[in-house]
Every structure is written in structure tokens, then in C-alpha cells.
């Protein structure tokens, strides 16, 4: 299986990255091909809302989003990885998702498998409600097949994350595919 991981944290050595690395390790042990994009290091502009693409055509913006598109369309799975910022996904990840607009119909109906990897400082039971709702809406709209969510409560720094159960859960999710 070909898996595309969109790593949406601007902190390449942070808690989100720990989950991503563990997920990838598990998936590769099962001999899956994994392509990882560290979005914050890429040149991807926000959607202009011009709809010149007609929801299924070339985007007027020429940037690194085309690299993601070329990897994602022939893939079997999409993994969204993000820290929780103000109870939602990072702006970096949201920009990429908004840019799905130009290949909307190609994504919808592919029935890609999907997963969500996320971390937050908070430990309140409601911490991830808005993000999970957004993810589930994307799953429904894009006709994805959710394989699981790793919701890393209380992962405010690398030490907290490393000593939590979540890296192992991310590994297990990757290995279970």
C-alpha cells in the first residue's frame, strides 16, 4: 500500500513528529511505501477561492502543492498529522486541505484509507472535539475509509509525548495496516 503522510507541524522535532515517525516505522515494517511531506518546509499558498480549476483542473497557483497532488492521487492512504492549535488543525495543514479543491473529484470516490495523528497540551475530555469533527467531516465528504485516530492528550512537549502511550499507539496503527 502507498501511504502519503501530511505532517502539518512547523516544529519538525516536536510531538507531532514523534507520532509520525512511529506510525511510519510501523507501516514500513509491514512493507508499505510511505511518502512524507513536511508541509511547513514547502512553498504552498492558500487557496484563492477563484475556482478557475473547476474543482478538477490545474490550479492557477504554481507551487509545491503539485508535488503533493502527484503523490496523493495514486496513493492508497492519506494520513493527516497536526498539533492542535486553538482546537483545530495547524494552518499549514489546513492550507493543503483547502488546495484539494483543484483535484476534488479525483479524491472523492477513490475511497482512500485515512488516519489522523494529533497531539495537544490539554488533557480535558473535550480537547479534540472540534478537530475530530472536522476530520470526520472530511472523511465523509471525500469518501475516505478511516483507519483510526491517535489523539495525544497531554503531549505538550517532546518529553511528555515520548513518555506517553501515544508513540506506541501510532506505531501499532501503522503496523496494523
Task: Pin down the residues of each PLM region.
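Short, glycine-/small-residue-rich phosphate/pyrophosphate-handling segment
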Residues: 91-92, 108-149
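Short, glycine/serine-rich, charged loops/turns that create anion-binding
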Residues: 10-11, 121-123, 154
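Conserved adenylate-forming
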Residues: 105
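N-terminal beta1-alpha1-beta2 submodule of the flavodoxin-like/Rossmannoid cofactor-binding fold
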Residues: 1-81, 87-102, 151, 159, ...
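Short active-site-adjacent structural elements
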Residues: 125-126, 157-159
